């Protein structure tokens, strides 16, 4: 019988009480030392989990050392957010086992997943099946993943894909505008998607301010992902201020 793993159970239990804030760290952009520092700070501020990964696909020792540093510095769950099948580290707690549903390339829909599946099993990492949708502009991830980004003014297309993902058995839906996107996913799109699906909705990309985080949550997002705004804050003090600001937007 299929039963939910520890991290997925943690997500569902926390969602019964509040909206969640995940911080995404890209091993291409942060050293293990900085990753550890940001993770420990995230935990103090009230962030709920750390995601590790990026579209250009850091792997091997670079990825492992960042995941290890995070595990040593905080008690937050570490969830892999792989750009491809190389983005797997045995030190992580869970992996968003995701399919880029609006890719034009079957490699990003099921190919990379097949190549990584046995490794996930061998390492005993908890897989969390997720439908991943790229919304305009899509940024680097849209280009790398050969996506056909969903137009910002077509929420119904996003909702159709999201519902298809749920019906295919995926237990989370992620709307992604792309790291560093000029604007986040539009609230109208978040709202429509949330109305049609029954699984938790994650929204990320372009969320830089308390107001943007609050607007996404108000529209229906269950989990907000931030990353670039924190990584690019300029100093550790500024990163903490930005984290606190974004967390206020999510938690209210």
Curated annotation (Swiss-Prot):
GO cellular component, one term: cytoplasm
Main enzyme class: transferase
Biochemical pathway: Membrane lipid metabolism; glycerophospholipid metabolism
Catalytically driven reaction(s): sn-glycerol 1-phosphate + (2E,6E,10E)-geranylgeranyl diphosphate = sn-3-O-(geranylgeranyl)glycerol 1-phosphate + diphosphate
Gene3D superfamilies: FMN-linked oxidoreductases
Main localization, broad class: cytoplasm
Enzyme Commission numbers on file: 2.5.1.41
The protein's required cofactors: Mg(2+)
Coiled-coil portions: none
Any Pfam family the entry gives: PcrB
Record: residues binding sn-glycerol 1-phosphate: 174-180, 205-206, 227-228
GO terms assigned for molecular function: imidazoleglycerol-phosphate synthase activity; magnesium ion binding; phosphoglycerol geranylgeranyltransferase activity
InterPro entries referenced in this protein's UniProt entry, alphabetically: GGGP/HepGP_synthase_sf, GGGP_HepGP_synthase, GGGP_synth, IGPS_HisA/HisF
Residues at which Mg(2+) binds: 26, 55
UniProt record, GO biological process: glycerophospholipid biosynthetic process
Cell location: Cytoplasm
Keyword terms: Cytoplasm, Lipid biosynthesis, Lipid metabolism, Magnesium, Metal-binding, Phospholipid biosynthesis, Phospholipid metabolism, Transferase
Entry's family note: Belongs to the GGGP/HepGP synthase family. Group II subfamily.
UniProt function note: Prenyltransferase that catalyzes the transfer of the geranylgeranyl moiety of geranylgeranyl diphosphate (GGPP) to the C3 hydroxyl of sn-glycerol-1-phosphate (G1P). This reaction is the first ether-bond-formation step in the biosynthesis of archaeal membrane lipids.
Subunit structure: Homotetramer. Homohexamer.
Protein name: Geranylgeranylglyceryl phosphate synthase
């Amino acid at each position: 019988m299929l039963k939910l793993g520890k991290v997925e159970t943690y997500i569902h239990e926390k969602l019964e009480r509040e909206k969640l804030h995940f911080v995404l760290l890209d091993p291409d952009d942060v050293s293990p030392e900085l990753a550890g520092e940001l993770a420990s700070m995230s935990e103090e501020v009230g962030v709920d989990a750390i995601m590790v990964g990026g579209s250009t696909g850091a792997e091997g020792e670079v990825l492992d050392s960042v995941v290890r540093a995070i595990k040593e510095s905080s008690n937050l769950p570490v969830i892999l957010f792989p750009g491809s099948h190389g983005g797997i580290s045995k030190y992580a707690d869970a992996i968003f086992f995701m399919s880029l549903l609006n890719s034009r390339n079957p490699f990003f829909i099921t190919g990379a997943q097949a190549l990584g599946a046995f490794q996930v099993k061998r390492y005993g990492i908890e897989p969390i099946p997720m439908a991943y949708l790229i919304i305009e502009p899509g940024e680097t991830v849209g280009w790398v993943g050969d996506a056909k980004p969903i137009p910002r003014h077509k929420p119904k297309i996003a909702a159709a894909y999201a519902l298809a993902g749920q019906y295919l058995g995926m237990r989370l839906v992620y709307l992604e505008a792309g790291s560093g996107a000029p604007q986040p996913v539009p609230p109208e799109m978040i709202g429509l998607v949330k109305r049609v699906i029954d699984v938790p909705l994650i929204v990320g990309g372009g969320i830089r301010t308390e107001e943007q985080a609050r607007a996404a949550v108000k529209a229906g997002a269950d989990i907000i992902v931030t990353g670039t705004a924190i990584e690019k804050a300029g100093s550790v003090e500024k990163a903490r201020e930005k984290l606190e600001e974004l967390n206020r937007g999510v938690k209210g």
